[in-house]
Amino acid sequence: MQDTTLKKIIQDKSEWIRLRKEKQPLIDFKDKINKKTRDFYHSLKEKKPCFILEYKKKSPSLGIIRNNFNLIEISNVYKKYASSVSVLTDEKYFHGNLNFINIVRECVSQPVLCKDFFIDPYQVYLSRYYNADAILLMLSVLNDIQYKELSIIAKKLNMGILTEVNNIEELKRALKLNANIIGINNRNLHDLSIDLNRTRTLSSLIKKDTIIISESGIKKYREIKELSKFVNGFLIGSHLMSQTNLETAVRSIIFGDNKVCGLTRSIDIEVSEKYGAIYGGLIFVKNSPRYITKKTAKNISINRKLKLIGIFQNENINIIVDIAEELSLYGVQLHGQENKQYIDKLRNILPKKINIWKAFSIQSELPDRNWDNVNMYIFDSDSGGSNTSFNWSILNHHILDNVILAGGINLKNCITASKLKCSGLDLNSGVEISPGIKDYKKIKSIFQKLRYG
């Protein structure tokens, strides 16, 4: 949002306030305001990292972000993962509305942040009248006197305050103003560029008892893991709103793109999905202790939401295509000596919507990851499903966005594994009671660790 755009927004906001005061005078509703709010501060302090997930239909820089902007559908996803939620209420530039707050609040139990351009005391009263639990105060548009005036009213109404800063000068002001929740906006308001390093730089100047939220530009789980050491949590909006599958997008950014492999029972598919997995692995390798037939796979995967991956090893291409099509697999994972020519041939026959993943047994060095027609790579130990790991140190200093890490991942080492900058983890023997029989407690615990560890 460039300076000229921001100035225009503030000008238009002033006019909106003038007209709204005529239509809905403060005297008409001030005495009707309920001061019983949900505790915004506590929701962000309770667990780290915390997540403020945002409802945003449009922005000045991106235009329409989400065409199917259904507040109830979005809420049904957010309520499972958010610490608090944020609702854009600016009408002209973000297609928001104050009425959204009550709709959302009826659907979720979390505190609701009203995100708008607050410049007038009237707005604070109005947002609370519409049941907002917290407000955003931007130091890029408020001077210290204005900030104090608005914050005093918010506190009298028992509302939380997210104080947003964009540079070191604004941060110094926020500290002098004793802001207890500071949001660091990673977006440059001059050229709209994103710099996540701003979170690292500014957070080092903030006292430890202040809650720090990183805002804007967060898109990947590895960014969450990297920045969590500097902040308490994240406000994420545009990235999530731009995704067709919102549930998958939220899971991806909070837990990573994780797969529970070796599934043999429908209950294990349900549990894996419930606790945060995106992918489920079905093994069609006959010498595997987790082997299942096509018929069994079809029976256990009815009405599932997991993206199912079929695991094959040096299999006849026609058999792979037959199973993949009949089971509507999301992808096929090749776990043998399949070469580039084999994969090219498979790609020509396999429906385009079905992904191809290639697994490698890692020893002393990393393989080439520029194969045509491969969508994802699996880095595994010599024998998959054996609960053994390769030497993960060889992954250091590599960006591995197209790699899922496999091999011996369990409750003891999953945090270490999650910090290796892979797209996600492949969980198998480390979450089992016995081969092919998953342990629900281990699955739940490992996903909790991946989120909060």
Curated annotation (Swiss-Prot):
GO biological process, one term: L-tryptophan biosynthetic process
GO molecular function, one term: indole-3-glycerol-phosphate synthase activity
CDD domains: IGPS (cd00331), PRAI (cd00405)
Region (Indole-3-glycerol phosphate synthase): 1-257
Residue ranges, annotated region (N-(5'-phosphoribosyl)anthranilate isomerase): 258-453
PANTHER family the record matches: INDOLE-3-GLYCEROL-PHOSPHATE SYNTHASE, TRYPTOPHAN BIOSYNTHESIS PROTEIN
Name this protein carries in UniProt: Tryptophan biosynthesis protein TrpCF
Species the sequence originates in: Buchnera aphidicola subsp. Acyrthosiphon pisum (strain APS) (Acyrthosiphon pisum symbiotic bacterium)
Gene: trpC
